[in-house]
Regions:
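Conserved, mostly hydrophobic/aromatic
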Residues: 11, 39, 100, 169, ...
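Active-site beta-loop-alpha junctions enriched in small/polar residues
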Residues: 12-15, 42-46, 72-78, 113-115, ...
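Conserved N-terminal beta1-alpha1 strand-loop-helix module at the mouth
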Residues: 1-41
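Active-site mouth loops of central-metabolism enzymes
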Residues: 7-23, 69-82, 88, 145-161, ...
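Glycine-rich, positively charged N-terminal anion/phosphate-binding segment
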Residues: 21-29, 47-65
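Active-site pocket-lining/capping segments in soluble small-molecule metabolic enzymes
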Residues: 19, 123-149, 155, 197-257, ...
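Glycine-rich, proline-tolerant flexible connector loops at the mouths of alpha/beta enzymes
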Residues: 35-57, 113-125, 174-188, 194, ...
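Glycine-rich anion/phosphate-binding loops
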Residues: 75-99, 122-126
Length: 298
């Protein structure tokens, strides 16, 4: 029995409103030429107005660029009223798209969101499952995507508990999953096997982030302490720590190797964390495009 060809998709983030949109608009126009299956747009917890950042950028990608889009919605600092308002804003985008007949169902990546030190969370959405259930009740026409963590959520006591919580997300209404970035494919495959044993049978898209410079690597090591770094990856960071050009080349090559291996092992999709860098997306696309089918998810 033949398997469906995997998808290649991108993640971008809205720029700080004080910086302006020129750079992200230019990057997205370049990314459009790569025909991604979809683009996801992140949202910041309690930092910028979601309507003025995530919703606006989602609107541009779907209406102006005609690319299927997933809007991130972290809810730990939102009330039910604010989430309902955001869903209504996204509905307006969906209505416009329906008129233009460009893309299909509006999708949301439902997240709890990161805890901000010294900022008190709201009480309506303690977990992503709470948000998923609320969306299904209030706006069931939205397709919901969930986040998952091949090496365990930082707040989970162990992977068994983490996968049990993930099963609750899927049962609540997630139709697919996107992983946190990882550098060890074997850990991803082990995670997939455990998900299958737990009865999680939705597509899992593998999150891949090419490491392009030393500062990016240092930030990653600080913020993603749960991620295992294979010996081969550590060797790249050590050998080219003071050679930016070689580090970028080796980081891109490592990501390409990961993707080729994932596709060979029948991954459902690869979700590329672009950091708004169109050149990164172009390089990955050029090296791997023959492996992917460029039909949008809908």
């Amino acid at each position: 029995m033949s398997r469906q060809t995997p998808s290649l998709s991108f993640e971008v983030f809205p720029p700080n409103p004080a910086v302006g949109n020129d750079n992200i608009i230019s990057a997205l126009q370049d990314m459009r030429e790569l025909t991604p299956h979809f683009i996801s747009v992140t949202a910041s917890n309690n930092k910028f107005n979601i309507k003025e950042t995530t919703v606006r950028l989602t609107d541009f990608i779907q209406n102006d660029l005609a690319i299927p889009t997933i809007a991130h919605l972290p809810a730990i600092y939102l009330t039910k009223e604010k989430v309902a308002e955001t869903l209504a804003d996204l509905d307006k985008v969906a209505e416009t798209i329906a008129d233009l007949d460009k893309v299909g169902v509006q999708k949301i990546l439902a997240l709890r969101g990161d805890i901000i030190p010294d900022v008190e969370p709201q009480k309506d959405f303690r977990y992503a499952t709470d948000l998923i259930e609320f969306i299904k009740e209030q706006a069931p026409h939205f397709e919901i995507v969930g986040a998952c963590y091949p090496e365990g959520h930082p707040d989970s006591p162990n992977q068994i508990s983490d996968i049990q919580n993930l099963k609750k997300k899927v049962d609540a209404g997630c139709s697919s999953l996107v992983t946190q970035l990882f550098f060890d494919n074997e850990r991803f495959y082990d995670f997939q096997d455990k998900c299958t044993l737990a009865g999680i049978d939705v597509p899992i898209h593998a999150g891949i982030m090419p490491i392009l410079n030393r500062n990016q690597a240092l930030r990653l090591l600080k913020t993603c302490e749960n991620i295992h770094l294979p010996r081969k990856f550590k060797a790249i960071l050590d050998k080219y720590e003071h050679d930016p050009e070689s580090l970028r080349a080796a980081g891109l090559a490592y990501a390409v190797d990961q993707i080729v291996d994932l596709v060979t092992q029948d991954v459902a999709g690869v979700h590329l964390y672009t950091m708004n860098n169109a050149e990164t997306a172009k390089y990955i696309h050029q090296a791997t495009h023959a492996l992917f089918n460029h039909q949008s998810l809908g």
